[in-house]
């Protein structure tokens, strides 16, 4: 027993989890009669996310996690999606730097790890939970509407609520079990994120409306750009 514990302590912690699960090259998922073009930053993305974006009328270009800001801007997307993925968000500073440069230039939607990465890009901090959130029955409250959603979760890190103060971020959702941050928004930048998995299948379907919100943000941003010329 003691020998096993010692071996566990001596095992080095890997910091390349996202690198190991992200796609190695760009690929495409097209849909009939597309209305929007989305770049999805793959940090370990589930295929059901791609299906839901396609179903919402989006052509999706899936890119490796370390795709540069310049490459993404060259694709001229209507929106950028930042996916779920494993590990500590601070282990992928290249994604954080890219998101910092994209702030205010394109609507963005992040889930799970993508949520944490957007938080860091806007100046908030993250920390490791004593007990990670796992399973498909986590109650989350939408602060603006008061609605309670049952959500699917699988993460070990969370956004520090105190660190949000003084940033452009607003907390939009909280976990009713431990009051941790479950959602963030920057309305003036058409950016929002959630800690849980709205695409979960099988799993609760309470939060699939978030994909519609992403579509609405892209449409609103497009209209705003057209107005200002």
Predicted regions and their residues:
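RNA-binding accessory domains that recognize and position tRNA/RNA substrates
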Residues: 1-70, 74-76, 89, 201, ...
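A glycine-centered loop/beta-turn motif at secondary-structure junctions
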Residues: 183-226
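Cysteine-nucleophile active-site neighborhood
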Residues: 74, 78-79, 83-161, 203-218
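Residues that mark the start of a beta-strand
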Residues: 35-39, 59, 107, 150, ...
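Hydrophobic residues at beta-strand termini and immediately following loops
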Residues: 41, 63, 129, 174, ...
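Active-site-proximal beta-strand elements of phosphoester/diester hydrolases
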Residues: 37-42, 151, 192-196
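Catalytic beta-strand/loop cores that center a nucleophilic Ser/Cys/Thr
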Residues: 147-189, 225-229
């Amino acid at each position: 027993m003691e020998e096993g514990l010692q071996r566990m302590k001596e095992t080095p912690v890997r910091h390349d989890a996202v690198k190991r699960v992200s796609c190695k090259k760009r690929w495409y998922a097209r849909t009939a009669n597309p209305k929007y073009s989305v770049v999805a930053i793959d940090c370990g993305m589930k295929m059901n996310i791609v299906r839901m974006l396609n179903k919402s009328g989006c052509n999706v270009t899936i890119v490796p996690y370390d795709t540069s800001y310049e490459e993404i801007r060259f694709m001229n997307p209507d929106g950028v999606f930042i996916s779920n993925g494993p590990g500590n968000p601070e282990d992928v500073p290249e994604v954080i730097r890219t998101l910092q440069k994209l702030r205010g230039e394109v609507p963005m939607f992040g889930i799970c790890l993508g949520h944490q990465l957007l938080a860091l890009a806007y100046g908030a901090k993250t920390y490791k939970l004593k007990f990670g959130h796992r399973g498909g029955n986590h109650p989350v409250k939408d602060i603006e509407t008061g609605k309670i959603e049952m959500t699917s979760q699988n993460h070990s890190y969370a956004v520090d609520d105190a660190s949000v103060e003084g940033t452009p971020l607003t907390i939009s959702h909280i976990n009713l079990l431990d009051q941790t941050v479950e959602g963030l928004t920057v309305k003036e930048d058409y950016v929002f994120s959630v800690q849980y998995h709205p695409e979960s299948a099988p799993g609760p379907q309470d939060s699939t409306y978030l994909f519609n919100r992403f579509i609405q943000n892209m449409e609103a941003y497009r209209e705003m750009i057209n107005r200002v010329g």
